[in-house]
Amino acid sequence: MVWDVFGWFRDVLASLGLWNKHGKLLFLGLDNAGKTTLLHMLKNDRLATLQPTWHPTSEELAIGNIKFTTFDLGGHVQARRLWKDYFPEVNGIVFLVDSADPDRFDEARVELDALFNITELKDVPFVILGNKIDAANAVSEAELRSALGLLNTTGSQRIEGQRPVEVFMCSVVMRNGYLEAFQWLSQYI
């Protein structure tokens, strides 16, 4: 009973922005999708020329009233084998897709479907970011949703027994679209 009252009080304070929450986020997706660039932009508010991620990296970020421990796990085939090691106690997954590389949409869908089928992640909210919308050959949100099989996401609704999933289109280099995704995600943490 005491914990219920404390939890209710904490939720009220958090809704008013008076309680700091903490979450663990994983940045996943295929190589060259923009995971490291996004994390660098969130941390340093500037672009940089970055090398592919060969080893997992961790950063502490504050977005709004939430402090995140983030893990950039790399997207090359060897790195994907390590993803499962970071699933315990994860609060959210940010899955990036290069929206200007439709040749790799099938590969991204296979990885995303595999993640959706992991029991340990059944309640973990997923943000799918269609990155690089500034590129001339980037697909639309509807095309990306179709290619990834994400036609019925939860949007802003909380649906009992259904994992929160939403797609946002963004351009990390143009600083566009990703903050909305983190605002959406923060309501579930």
From Swiss-Prot:
Cross-referenced SUPFAM superfamilies:
P-loop containing nucleoside triphosphate hydrolases
What is the recorded membrane topology of this protein?
Answer: Peripheral membrane protein
Specify the enzyme's EC class, one word. hydrolase
Instruction: Fetch the Gene3D superfamilies from UniProt.
Output: P-loop containing nucleotide triphosphate hydrolases
User: Could you tell me one molecular function GO term of this UniProt entry?
Assistant: GTP binding
Where primarily located? membrane
- Write one Pfam family the protein is assigned to: Arf
Where does the protein end up?
A: Cytoplasmic vesicle, COPII-coated vesicle membrane; Endoplasmic reticulum membrane; Golgi apparatus membrane
Q: Which InterPro entries match?
A: P-loop_NTPase, Small_GTP-bd, Small_GTPase_ARF/SAR, Small_GTPase_SAR1
Annotated PROSITE patterns: SAR1
Residues annotated for GTP binding in this entry = 29-36, 72-75, 131-134
Q: So what EC number does this one have?
A: 3.6.5.-
What CDD domains has UniProt attached to this entry? Answer: Sar1
- Give GO cellular component annotations, separated by semicolons: COPII vesicle coat; endoplasmic reticulum exit site; endoplasmic reticulum membrane; Golgi membrane; mitochondria-associated endoplasmic reticulum membrane contact site; mitochondrion
Q: Catalysed reaction(s)?
A: GTP + H2O = GDP + phosphate + H(+)
Sequence intervals crossing the membrane: none
The lineage's top-level taxon is Eukaryota
Asked whether the UniProt record includes Hydrolase among its keywords, one would answer yes
PANTHER family in the record, alphabetically?
RE74312P (PTHR45684)
> Which family does the similarity line name?
Belongs to the small GTPase superfamily. SAR1 family.
Q: What does this protein do?
A: Small GTPase component of the coat protein complex II (COPII) which promotes the formation of transport vesicles from the endoplasmic reticulum (ER). The coat has two main functions, the physical deformation of the endoplasmic reticulum membrane into vesicles and the selection of cargo molecules. SAR1 controls the coat assembly in a stepwise manner. Activated SAR1-GTP binds to membranes first and recruits the SEC23/24 complex. These SEC23/24-SAR1 prebudding intermediates are then collected by the SEC13/31 complex as subunits polymerize to form coated transport vesicles.
NCBIfam families according to UniProt: small_GTP
Q: Quaternary structure per UniProt?
A: COPII is composed of at least 5 proteins: the SEC23/24 complex, the SEC13/31 complex and SAR1.
Question: Can you name this protein?
Answer: Small COPII coat GTPase SAR1
Q: What is the lineage of its organism?
A: Eukaryota, Fungi, Dikarya, Ascomycota, Saccharomycotina
